[in-house]
């Protein structure tokens, strides 16, 4: 019941805290507006009331938290007092540990604890604790827990005869040592271990080496072009061989109407034919007299 009450009060306090914060915000926003003096005074009074209520709520929170803390400390103190009352007032002397008991007054006596002797092995050693009473101090011997972890034992090696015998539904004979009933029930398992699987590796295909041909372009020599030199034209030697002067008379009476004297220049070609292109008249050469040998009557 107390827990539910505390939860309810906490929820109500949270709600009031939130509402008061909202009211403060709203009042501050309204105060910033240019209202009349009366409205501003009322808003300021509301803000003061809300701020005081917030302070009260915070005090309630702190008080409830302190109450919870005091409750827990009181419970712990009650538990410790009950443990002290239930403990034995005195114990017999233990000769193995060599513990001596002495009655001491409350002013001089202080609770002392002897630490437990811990060995590297996993064996547990007793640990002594002292409890303070009004006039005497008593010790309790409590077995201490082993500090070191126990090593896990390795499983025993299985015999070679039974290979994974827990799978089978029958009892292998390797287990039966001297039990006749076991020998009557058991069955012998052959000593054949599963052989190693022969793994055939895939044969690699022979790699055909392809030699790259030289893809160089074949250099063909250009055909020799016959260069014909221009033949020299034969030089025509023109020589004056025969100069014929002809004197033509139209009538035998001695009245020359037209006299003409032709002078032909014959050029000697390689064939020997005279070239008729060169014809000279006597009018062109007036200074040369006609020769008597070439005249015809």
Curated annotation (Swiss-Prot):
Keywords: Disulfide bond, Glycoprotein, Host cell membrane, Host membrane, Host-virus interaction, Membrane, Secreted, Transmembrane, Transmembrane helix, Viral attachment to host cell, Viral immunoevasion, Virion, Virus entry into host cell. Residues 67-297 are extracellular. Glycans are attached at residues 70, 72, 80, 85-87, 92, 100, 103, 105, 113, 119, 135, 137-139, 144, 147, 199, 203, 219, 231, 235, 237, 251, 253, 269, 275, 282-283, 287, 294. One of its GO terms (biological process) is virion attachment to host cell. Residues 211-232 have a biased composition (Basic and acidic residues). Residues 254-285 have a biased composition (Polar residues). Disulfide bonds join 173-186, 176-182. Pfam families: Glycoprotein_G. Residues 103-161, 190-297 are annotated as: Disordered. Residues 287-297 have a biased composition (Pro residues). GO terms for cellular component: extracellular region; host cell plasma membrane; membrane; virion membrane. Residues 105-147, 235-253 have a biased composition (Low complexity). Residues 190-207 have a biased composition (Basic residues). The keyword Membrane applies. This is Major surface glycoprotein G. It comes from Human respiratory syncytial virus A (strain rsb5857).
């Amino acid at each position: 019941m107390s827990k539910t009450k505390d939860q309810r009060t906490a929820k109500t306090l949270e709600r009031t805290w939130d509402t008061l914060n909202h009211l403060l915000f709203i009042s501050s926003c309204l105060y910033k507006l240019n209202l009349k003096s009366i409205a501003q005074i009322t808003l300021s009074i509301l803000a003061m009331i809300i701020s005081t209520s917030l302070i009260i709520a915070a005090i309630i929170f702190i008080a409830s938290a302190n109450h919870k803390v005091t409750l827990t400390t009181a419970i712990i103190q009650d538990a410790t007092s009950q443990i002290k009352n239930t403990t034995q007032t005195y114990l017999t002397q233990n000769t193995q540990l060599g513990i001596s008991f002495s009655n001491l007054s409350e002013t001089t006596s202080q609770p002392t604890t002897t630490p437990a002797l811990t060995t590297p092995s996993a064996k547990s050693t007793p640990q002594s604790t002292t409890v303070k009473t009004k006039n005497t101090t008593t010790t309790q011997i409590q077995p201490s827990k082993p500090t070191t972890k126990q090593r896990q034992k390795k499983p025993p090696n299985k015999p070679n005869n039974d290979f994974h015998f827990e799978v089978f539904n029958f009892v292998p004979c390797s287990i039966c040592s001297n039990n006749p009933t076991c020998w009557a029930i058991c069955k012998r398992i052959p000593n054949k271990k599963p052989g190693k699987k022969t793994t055939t590796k895939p044969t690699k295909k022979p790699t055909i080496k392809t030699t790259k041909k030289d893809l160089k372009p074949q250099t063909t020599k250009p055909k020799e072009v016959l260069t014909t030199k221009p033949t020299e034209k034969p030089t025509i030697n023109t020589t004056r061989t025969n100069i014929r002067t002809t004197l033509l008379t139209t009538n035998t009476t001695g009245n020359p109407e037209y006299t003409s004297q032709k002078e032909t220049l014959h050029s000697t070609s390689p064939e020997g034919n005279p070239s008729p292109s060169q014809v000279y008249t006597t009018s062109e050469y007036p200074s040369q007299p006609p020769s008597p040998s070439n005249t015809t009557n």
